Amino acid sequence: MHEFTPRQIVEKLNEHVIGQADAKRAVAIALRNRYRRQLLDPSLRDEVTPKNILMIGPTGVGKTEIARRLAKLVRAPFVKIEATKFTEVGYVGRDVESMVRDLVEASLRLVKDEKKEALKERAEAVANERIVDALVGKKASTGLGGGNPFEMLFGGTQKPPEQETANDTADRSVIRQQLFQGQLEDRMIDVDIEERQMDLFSGQQGMEGLANLQDMLGQVMPKKTKKRQLSVKEARPILTAEEAERLLDLNEVHDEAVRRAEQMGIIFVDEIDKIATKGQDSAGVSREGVQRDILPIVEGSTVVTKYGPVKTDHMLFIAAGAFHMAKPSDLIPELQGRFPIRVELDSLTEDDFVKILTEPNQALLKQYKALLGAEQVHVTFTEDAIRQIARIAAQVNDETDNIGARRLYTIMERVLEELSFEAAEMPETDVTITPQYVMDRVGKVADDRDLSQFIL
């Protein structure tokens, strides 16, 4: 984390998200403060808590993407949840503590991936030995000389153990050398693969306890294996992953996952405006109950998970909402106070759409060009055509519902629909997208307000 200053974090975010400078600065400062906190005296460190962020802005302007890219940048555990999925304690539905359990699971996957990468060489060496075992076994079972089939039953010409061991060692040495030289990649072998246990209850509402029980039973019960016939090339990554899993110190992984979730975890609470209350009708009371349930998690509490107790005191919470029908002040005062940093995100303009289409590392135009390029159809967009697409997106957003940058996906699909359908049967060709090409396919629909509501 210490590698990135706030300015560098903003520059990294600029590679993926256009505009929204205030939001980027806010999350960059919050992230840097985490690093600063680690440098403090331990007695003071526990007193410094993250300053949670409330993002206010319409859909499709980059709220979620900023948080997701931020987490990816520093390899922090990240989970996105929707406030509307939760119900008040005592009702059927997901309880708010499940967001912390989800974060720990995300942290566990992150730590496991890192540990497996570090163990990859050792795991691959063990996997190669298993492949050699399979190859030697296959050679032995087919018989070297194809002699009398009754020899196996009566042992008439069985070799002495010393000779058998020497021959096996010689065989293994030859096969190992051929394997490392890549001569046996297409050879078929029989390997025993551990069957993955089906997670019956994961993600189901109200089933967290049963998921924990299933996990405990899975550790006690013997693991099932299934024999599969694969080529050496196909078997190697499967066996390597299996061996890496065995080499993991699960206690160490669990401890690190919990530590990272507590100290670096980011929870993105979307649609928080939907649980804001105005009146005191029954629905309003229920939504207020959800807010009061979320409050202790954000304030700092301990949640019991199957990996041990997890403290939420130093997790960073980023809440977001459009706040069309409600205001931030409609949230209960205690919850408002837990999100001291408020950032308003701007609606996207025509110029923003042009930048979104062209500037990010994996810009939308680059994606479509690559997709069609896979069929040897090479597409180029003129600058005027890009401007035309951006203009139509801004126009439709203004005249109908404003869905931000997601409007570009709809329009791009309409523009390239015919080409995408025909590309597989076309010879290698170059296609230039002009403003007229764009207007021929979406112009009439964009201009007709009734049609654009249903189609774009």
UniProtKB/Swiss-Prot annotation:
UniProt keyword list: ATP-binding, Chaperone, Cytoplasm, Nucleotide-binding, Stress response
InterPro entries, per database record: AAA+_ATPase (IPR003593), ATP-dep_Clp_protease_ClpX (IPR050052), ATPase_AAA_core (IPR003959), Clp_ATPase_C (IPR019489), HslU (IPR004491), P-loop_NTPase (IPR027417)
CDD domains: RecA-like_HslU
SUPFAM superfamilies xref list: P-loop containing nucleoside triphosphate hydrolases
Main localization (coarse): cytoplasm
Alphabetized GO MF terms: ATP binding; ATP hydrolysis activity; peptidase activity; proteasome-activating activity
Entry keyword Oxidoreductase: no
Signal peptide (from-to): none
UniProt GO BP: protein unfolding; proteolysis involved in protein catabolic process
Residues binding ATP: 18, 60-65, 270, 334, 406
Superkingdom as given in the UniProt entry: Bacteria
Annotated localization: Cytoplasm
GO (cellular component) term, any one: HslUV protease complex
Function text: ATPase subunit of a proteasome-like degradation complex; this subunit has chaperone activity. The binding of ATP and its subsequent hydrolysis by HslU are essential for unfolding of protein substrates subsequently hydrolyzed by HslV. HslU recognizes the N-terminal part of its protein substrates and unfolds these before they are guided to HslV for hydrolysis.
NCBIfam families on file: hslU (TIGR00390), PRK05201.1 (NF003544)
Subunit structure: A double ring-shaped homohexamer of HslV is capped on each side by a ring-shaped HslU homohexamer. The assembly of the HslU/HslV complex is dependent on binding of ATP.
Family per record: Belongs to the ClpX chaperone family. HslU subfamily.
Name by which UniProt lists this protein: ATP-dependent protease ATPase subunit HslU
